[in-house]
Design a protein with these regions (language model features):
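Short, basic, low-complexity termini and linkers enriched in Ser/Thr/Gly/Pro
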Residues: 126-141
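Cell wall/extracellular polymer interaction/catalysis modules
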Residues: 1-121, 126
Length: 141
């Protein structure tokens, strides 16, 4: 679920209604390449490897965009090019902390599902004003 702000987008990632982590993204700038978050919608996830980012997640079939990833970063304006980062805590608009830690936990959750040949669908939508979440404590081991 997303909340839109002038300097970034803050969100919450949940699985079957159970809070998993927060997310940060660039602000909405009409889906412009490398400077905007992506449109709300349903996106299938896939495993992807690159020498720079190592193993991460790819969002398939994003309208008018390519290589939209979920990977660790802590400041969308400085580090993102339209991708999504999981974070443990939101520290500002499009900013958070401990992204690498929570990203490893996210991969540990998603990768086994993908390796079984099952689909994982990410649904991106705007947070309603009455939305509430149950949050799991994410340990920093």
């Amino acid at each position: 679920m997303r909340e839109y702000f002038p300097n970034g987008v803050n969100g919450a990632l949940s699985v079957n209604g159970e809070g998993l982590c927060h997310t940060i993204e660039l602000p909405w700038r009409d889906n412009q390449h490398a400077i905007s978050c992506i449109p709300e919608g349903r996106y299938e996830l896939a495993k992807r490897f690159s020498p720079k980012l190592r193993w991460h997640l790819l969002l398939k079939a994003v309208p008018e965009r390519d290589l939209i990833l979920i990977h660790p970063y802590n400041d969308a304006e400085k580090e993102a090019q339209g991708c999504i980062a999981p974070v443990t805590t939101i520290t500002g608009e499009g900013k958070g902390d401990n992204s690498r830690i929570v990203f490893e936990k996210l991969k540990a959750f998603v990768y086994p599902v993908l390796e079984r040949g099952e689909k994982v669908i990410l649904v991106i939508s705007q947070k309603s004003k009455v939305e509430s979440h149950k949050w799991k404590k994410i340990s920093r081991e």
